[in-house]
């Protein structure tokens, strides 16, 4: 896994450079990356576990060739709404009553050599290089915290005069058993 109970992270992360830093807020330029993502219907809580399980099965060998793929961080999650391309970490984003969850694939893989998923609900795609605003926080990765930190990042972007071009998405870097105050969580928003 990517972290011990005490918080030591060992998982690879997507490459990026920091363009601007202001306390917990950053603007980053991410390299292009490949993600495995799935879209699920339901609440944040219910789709978090289901999405993670689907994607974990894929990287643990439920793919053509039964190849194991190293776990990376973060896990990305976002709500499905408008058609907005997704970026880095394990990410989760909301889409109406649907949530997207994605694992970033290790950098050594390409679309050509990455094992194909057996599960038809898992989509493999390349995410182009992009500029992303982020805010880092610790604690529980709850829907309430995601909404709170998304609002803070949106407000910071407005004060900076930076235009957001995506919905907020969450990025979690640690397994669920990590002590909450040691967890690394982030909110990401694509920007111009």
Residue ranges of predicted features:
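A solvent-exposed interaction/effector surface
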Residues: 1-192
């Amino acid at each position: 896994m990517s972290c011990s109970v005490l918080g030591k992270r060992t998982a690879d992360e997507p490459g990026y450079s920091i363009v601007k830093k202001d306390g917990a807020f950053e603007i980053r330029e991410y390299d292009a990356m490949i993600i495995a993502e799935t879209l699920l219907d339901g609440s944040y809580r219910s789709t978090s576990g289901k999405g993670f399980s689907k994607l974990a099965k894929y990287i643990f060998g439920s793919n053509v060739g039964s190849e194991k793929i190293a776990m990376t961080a973060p896990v990305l999650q976002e709500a499905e709404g408008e058609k907005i391309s997704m970026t880095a970490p394990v990410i989760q984003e909301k889409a109406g009553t649907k949530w997207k969850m994605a694992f970033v694939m290790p950098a050594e893989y390409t679309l050509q050599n990455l094992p194909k998923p057996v599960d038809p609900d898992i989509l493999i795609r390349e995410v182009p290089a992009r500029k992303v605003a982020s805010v880092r926080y610790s604690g529980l990765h709850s829907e309430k915290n995601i909404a709170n930190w998304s609002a803070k990042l949106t407000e910071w972007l407005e004060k900076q005069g930076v235009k957001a071009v995506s919905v907020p998405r969450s990025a979690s870097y640690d397994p669920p058993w990590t002590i909450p105050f040691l967890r690394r969580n982030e909110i990401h928003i694509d920007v111009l």
